[in-house]
């Protein structure tokens, strides 16, 4: 057997492996346990290892690379059309080998271990923010039934709950106490994690460069470096904005061209963070405009004029799109953003 490329359908305990020769013809198939697959990577001569970009894919990509193989991760959505007839593990492994031969199908860049760890911090932070919001909404909804209106924000709700408990039955007050403790604990965890991200950003030149862009702070800068394995893989800045789902969805045919709302494809967390950053930059532009039009940068003038012609939300999304393009340019050129 002279296999030059190997398709692997990953799972927790069983790995389906297909072997293809230089002509792309599948010459053998195997079904391996986890231990057998680990030994296989050590003993198999160097080859291209093709896998779906799914859970554990980065671990196996790093392991394959350590043993001299050339790992390749493909997006599962784009591999699916190459599955013939019924879906089985063997069919999925075969489809990976067919998809790899498509010149228009770009592989998913493999993240470094540091990028994976940094992305893990952001996933933990995201989960804490979600949990905190759920607890606050629960307390707010329950107390609203007793005529208590709570302010927005975690700090406001904790302070108000300690001040106002008149008319609330004691059993409910007792049940809300651990929820309040949980909200305060999550607040402390978030502050600690944000300090950790700040320390990481201080020592990373790429993050420092990103933070020269209006609306980009520690959270966006660290999230970008963690999530985008290789920004040079985007040939143009517009491709990067499209990858983030910040470009219009298109439905065109013949002479008719229709552009809809933004596609919202790609990394939703990055898109949300960029949108928050854009709203912050837009608010700053308004404050700057109050000091005089002559104090505005060209980017601020552009977004304020766009807001006057359209809508605040559309202007914020357009600015997020612009920020994504600036991020790609400053990163590929390795230079700070210079406001004009």
Could you describe each region identified by the protein language model?
Residues 1-340:
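A detector of single, family-specific signature residues
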